[in-house]
Amino acid sequence: MKKSARRQSRELATQGLYQWLLSNAAPGEIDAQLRGALGYDKADKELLDAILHGVIREHATLIEALTPSLDRPVDQLSPVERAVLLIATFELTHHVETPYRVIINEAVELAKTFGGSDGYKYVNGVLDKLAAKLRPAETQARRNG
C-alpha cells in the first residue's frame, strides 16, 4: 500500500528525532541527512519541518505534558517510543485540525514500524490517556458516540 505524504513525513520525523535524542545533533544536520533519506521526495515537507523543529524547540514543554500519562520516567522509554510520543503530543497540541484518533493511529503505526514488538500497545495506552487530557471535548464526544 502506498504511504501518504503525511505518513512519510511522520516516519522521517521519527527517524530525525531518534537521531536527535541519541546524539543531540544540530537540527540543520538532521535536516541535511533527512533530505537524502529514502522517501524524502514523497514527504509533506511542511509537515515534516513543523513536527521535527517543533518537537525539538518545545521538547521540555512536550515532556511536561506527556509525563503525567506515563507509568515510568521519560528516560526509561526507548528512544523510538519517546520520539513517537513526542510527535503525537506535538500534533495533539498544535494540529487541532487533525482528529485525535488519526494522531493516535499514526503513532501506533510508527511504533509498529520502528519500535519493539509490543511498544505500540504502550504508545496507544499513553496517548489514549493524554488525548483525554489535551482534547477532552473531542474524546468525550467520541466516547458518547
Swiss-Prot record:
- Keyword entries, A-Z: RNA-binding, Transcription, Transcription antitermination, Transcription regulation
Single GO biological process annotation from the record: transcription antitermination
One GO MF term, please? RNA binding
Q: Which InterPro entries match?
A: NusB-like_sf, NusB_fam, NusB_RsmB_TIM44
Protein origin, superkingdom: Bacteria
Cellular component GO terms held in the UniProt record: cytosol
Q: Which Pfam families match?
A: NusB
Q: Read off the SUPFAM superfamilies from this record.
A: NusB-like
Checking HAMAP family in the record gives: NusB (MF_00073)
State the family named in the UniProt similarity comment for this chain: Belongs to the NusB family.
Sum up the protein's function in the record's words: Involved in transcription antitermination. Required for transcription of ribosomal RNA (rRNA) genes. Binds specifically to the boxA antiterminator sequence of the ribosomal RNA (rrn) operons.
Protein's recorded name? Transcription antitermination protein NusB
Q: Which source organism does the UniProt entry give?
A: Burkholderia ambifaria (strain MC40-6)
Taxonomic lineage? Bacteria, Pseudomonadati, Pseudomonadota, Betaproteobacteria, Burkholderiales
